[in-house]
């Protein structure tokens, strides 16, 4: 997985609650050509949604997701983009445990 995603941007939105997270994920995938790679239930009601794609697309998607999340209420906690995550980060992104999807 690491070789096919090297150089692809990572976008993250953290929300208070599941409804803003779903709203953000929907807006991000509709706004730009990005791939929804997962979600993480952080604890205390916080949810992080992650997308991958080209830097410009991820930037547009995260902006749209943050705007949509704010329309739901005070659900937006943080929004961030990493243009090219270091290769040491890639294994963590592909791990189901990290994404809250334990097998």
Swiss-Prot record:
One MF term in GO for this entry? structural constituent of carboxysome shell
**Alphabetized PROSITE patterns for the sequence:** BMC_1, BMC_2
At the top level, the lineage of the source is Bacteria
Tell me the function of this protein: The major shell protein of the carboxysome, a polyhedral inclusion where RuBisCO (ribulose bisphosphate carboxylase, ccbL-ccbS) is sequestered. Assembles into hexamers which make sheets that form the facets of the polyhedral carboxysome. There are estimated to be 538 CsoS1 hexamers per carboxysome; note this number includes the probable carboxysome shell vertex proteins CsoS4A and CsoS4B.
Q: What does the record say about domains?
A: The tight homohexamer forms a small pore which is positively charged.
Q: Which family does it belong to?
A: Belongs to the bacterial microcompartments protein family. CsoS1 subfamily.
For this entry, the protein name equals: Major carboxysome shell protein CsoS1
Origin organism is Prochlorococcus marinus subsp. pastoris (strain CCMP1986 / NIES-2087 / MED4)
Per the record, the gene is csoS1
């Amino acid at each position: 997985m690491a070789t096919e995603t090297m150089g692809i941007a990572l976008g993250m939105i953290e929300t208070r609650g599941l409804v803003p997270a779903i709203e953000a994920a929907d807006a991000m995938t509709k706004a730009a050509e990005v791939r929804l790679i997962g979600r993480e239930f952080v604890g205390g009601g916080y949810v992080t949604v992650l997308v991958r794609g080209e830097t410009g697309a991820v930037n547009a998607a995260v902006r749209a997701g943050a705007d949509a999340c704010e329309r739901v209420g005070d659900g937006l906690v943080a929004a961030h983009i990493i243009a090219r995550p270091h290769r040491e980060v890639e294994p963590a992104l592909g791990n189901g445990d990290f994404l809250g999807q334990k097998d």
